[in-house]
Structures are given as structure tokens and as C-alpha cells.
Amino acid sequence: MKTISLRFLMTLGLMTLFVVSPFAQKDTGKIRIIMFGAHPDDCDERSGGTAALFARMVYAVKFVSVTNGDAGHQSMKGKELAKRRYAETQESAKRLGISYDVLDNHDGLLMPTLEVRLEIIKKIREWNADVVLAPRPNDYHPDHRYTGVLVQDAAYMVAVPDIEPEVPALRKNPVFLYYEDHFQRPNPFRPDVVVDITPVYDKKIACLDAHVSQMYEWLPWIGGYYEEVPKGKEERIQWLTARTSRPINAQTMASLEKWYGKERASKVKEVECFEVCEYGAQPSDTEIKRLFPMLGQ
């Protein structure tokens, strides 16, 4: 394995002091979940509702942004933007009751290097994760794709003692899952696990609302709908709620009925979906219910 320089290790140590969320959670002995996103709002968008449900059960949940988001704005940039977006992650963490870390990799320039892979391995080990969520490695944004690749590359290595030996290897392999996306090639997303987030949908909207630079500025600007964004706080929440809501398609409904039963599934309004990754532990339905105890409740 390539030798890592002392300078790199010192830099990584200093960086970690800056990016670790102050909203750390105690180890309760319950399921531990870590969710990776490329940018400091991605986890919120893909799994904010599921995180809220886990947090409500006092499970240990951590979001990790693999980049610092320093390119995601039409007028701000660099350190100023990264600082603002970090503050937004901490507000989101406070609203959800979770931990939120941000790695100091540049937005838009992420590559699946050994150094970043080791960062991912360390995060998973340090959290002693039972469940790991990440994007699929087929996506329009290179940072999303490479975040998926990096987590895939870590899936086996988290249990190998000689890799990153200063952090003890896991004695179990976590279950790795992908967030939902709409991309069809090389293969479409498969909703193996569908979580009813209707009871906590307001929590998801609240955590998204914390990312003001993204929800009300950058994404509307780059998406061509900036003029639609309301000015008032309450109007913005209503607008964001409407924009975030998605219809439940037939494939998702079939999986929802599997986990909740037809009667309950028919009443569900909002969901988040996940696909089991072929890497990592391969869970049975019984194990999925243990890891996602909100299923069927």
C-alpha cells in the first residue's frame, strides 16, 4: 500500500478537528447508522426522513458529506461558502438530533483516491456502523458517482485489520445500501427497502430548510426556477414541502406493501427508498426488519 506522508496525516488530523459535528451521540447499544453524501445537503435530501425516524428511536445516526460544498453557489465560493455550508449542516443536525461531519475535499473535484477511501473507512469504523448508506455510482454528478465508488471500495476493507490499522477494523461487515435515484443505465434502482416517512415529513423539510444556500439559492438558480422562490419564511416552507414531495410508483408501492401490508401502505404519503448493495453483509428480510425497526410500525 502506498505510504502516506506525515504531512498528510497531520493535515487530516487538523481537518478532523474542524469537521466533526458537536452534536455527537452517546453509544446506546442500539443500531448505528452512517449515511454518506457528496455534498452538505445530499444526505438530508435522500434520507432525512429515515434519519429522523432512527433519531426518534434514540439510534445513533451520522451524516457525512464527502466534500465541503465550496463550489455549490452562483455568487459565493471557496472558504466563505464552505464555512456557510458547514454551519447549515450543524443546524440540520440540531433539527434532526443527529451528528453531521463534513470532509475537507473540494466540491466538484472529488476523485476516488486512496486517501479519500481511507477517510471513508475510518468514518465507518469509528462509528462502528451496522448500516451504511450512500449514492449509487451512476449519477449525473461526478461527486455523487465517486462518493458511491468510494463507499463501495470501503465496503470490504472496513473489516481488514492491516488497512488503516490505527483505527480498529470492524468485526462485522455492515449492510450497505444505496439511496434512490431515477437513472436507468446500466441498471435501474431497485426499492428493496421502503420506509414510510409520513409521520416525520415535517422533520425532513425542516432539515432541508436549514440548507438555505441550496434550497432557496443555488438549486433554484442552476435549475432555472429561482424566480419561484418565495421571500417569506412560512411561504418558503410550504413551497419546499410541495417541491420535495414525490409520487409513489407501482414498484415502490409493491415493496411498501411487503413491509407494511396493503392497508397501511394505502395510507402512506411520503417514502424514502433504499437498495441493498451487493457488497457488504447480505441481509435476510428478518435482518432488514431488525436494522429498520420502523418497517411495519
Per-range role (PLM):
Residues M1-S5:
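N-terminal secretory signal peptides that target proteins for export/translocation
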Residues R7-V19:
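Bacterial N-terminal signal peptides
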Residues F8, N68, R136, E180, ...:
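Residues that line or immediately flank small-molecule/substrate-binding pockets and catalytic motifs
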Residues F23-W127, V149, M157:
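Active-site rim/loop-helix segments in enzyme catalytic domains that contact anionic ligands
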Residues H73-M76, N187-P191:
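Short acidic, glycine/proline-rich loop/turn micro-motifs
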